[in-house]
Amino acid sequence: MYAVFQSGGKQHRVAPGHTVRLEKLEVATGSTVEFDQVLLIADGEKVHVGAPLVAGGKVVAEVVSHGRGEKVTIVKFRRRKHHDKKMGHRQWFTEVKITAINA
């Protein structure tokens, strides 16, 4: 059984027991989160595709941790002008473990 749900403007394909990194959620570590923007649920031969969402579909997850991702380096450079600018960015994330998928 697997599902595709939407969180933080991105779509994630998950199954029970999977651990996923999502955009930062303002929830405490150890708490339970429910995602109701489910786009698809597949259970063996049966596939429920939403238009755009599956009615009554829900993905339940437990918050494992919060953190920051790998550093991304941004370099801006102007040729012949002796000008360059270097910046870095680390995106916040929330790591969740999928506990249940309800159709």
Curated annotation (Swiss-Prot):
Top-rank taxon: Bacteria
A Pfam family reported for this protein in Swiss-Prot or TrEMBL: Ribosomal_L21p
Gene (name only): rplU
GO cellular component term, pick one: ribonucleoprotein complex
Family named by the database record: Belongs to the bacterial ribosomal protein bL21 family.
Gene Ontology BP annotations: translation
GO terms of molecular function: rRNA binding; structural constituent of ribosome
Keyword match DNA-binding: no
Protein name: Large ribosomal subunit protein bL21
Function of the molecule: This protein binds to 23S rRNA in the presence of protein L20.
NCBIfam families named among the record's database cross-references: L21 (TIGR00061)
InterPro entries cross-referenced by the UniProt entry: bL21-like, bL21-like_sf, Ribosomal_bL21, Ribosomal_bL21_CS
Record keywords, A-Z: Ribonucleoprotein, Ribosomal protein, RNA-binding, rRNA-binding
